[in-house]
């Protein structure tokens, strides 16, 4: 009898669960920004450097002067 259950188990295959469809987001679901503080504009000349890496020093200095804080900006986000 155990041979019967073994053979039956080999024939029954679990169907994969259908992927849940992600809810689409449209413009009506997006609200206004909260706690937004505009610090500065960054132009193409501010970020490009000859070696392909961004020059963050000047931009960081602009941001520091705009926000009125002596915050040390991290270079970890620089690519």
UniProtKB/Swiss-Prot annotation:
Annotated localization: Cytoplasm, Cytoskeleton; Cell membrane
Compositional bias per record (Basic and acidic residues), positions renumbered to this chain: 63-72
Membrane topology type: Lipid-anchor
Taxonomic source organism: Xenopus tropicalis
Alphabetized InterPro entries for the sequence: CRIB_dom, CRIB_dom_sf, SPEC
Cross-referenced Gene3D superfamilies: CRIB domain
Region annotation Disordered: where it falls in the sequence: 41-79
Any Gene Ontology biological process: regulation of cell shape
Keywords: Cell membrane, Cell shape, Cytoplasm, Cytoskeleton, Lipoprotein, Membrane, Palmitate
Pfam families named among the record's database cross-references: PBD
UniProt family annotation: Belongs to the CDC42SE/SPEC family.
Lineage, uppermost ranks: Eukaryota, Metazoa, Chordata, Craniata, Vertebrata
GO molecular function: small GTPase binding
Lipidation (S-palmitoyl cysteine): 10-11
Source organism superkingdom: Eukaryota
Name under which the protein is recorded: CDC42 small effector protein 1
GO cellular component, one term: cytoplasm
Residue span(s) of domain CRIB: 30-43
Function noted in UniProt: Probably involved in the organization of the actin cytoskeleton by acting downstream of CDC42, inducing actin filament assembly.
Keyword Cytoplasm among UniProt keywords: yes
């Amino acid at each position: 009898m155990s041979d019967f259950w073994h053979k039956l188990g080999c024939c029954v295959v679990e169907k994969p669960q259908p992927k849940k469809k992600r809810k689409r987001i449209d413009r009506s679901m997006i609200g206004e920004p909260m706690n937004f503080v505009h610090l500065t504009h960054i132009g193409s000349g501010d970020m490009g450097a000859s070696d392909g890496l961004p020059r963050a020093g000047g931009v960081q200095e602009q941001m520091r002067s705009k926000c009125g804080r002596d915050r040390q900006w991290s270079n970890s986000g620089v690519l």
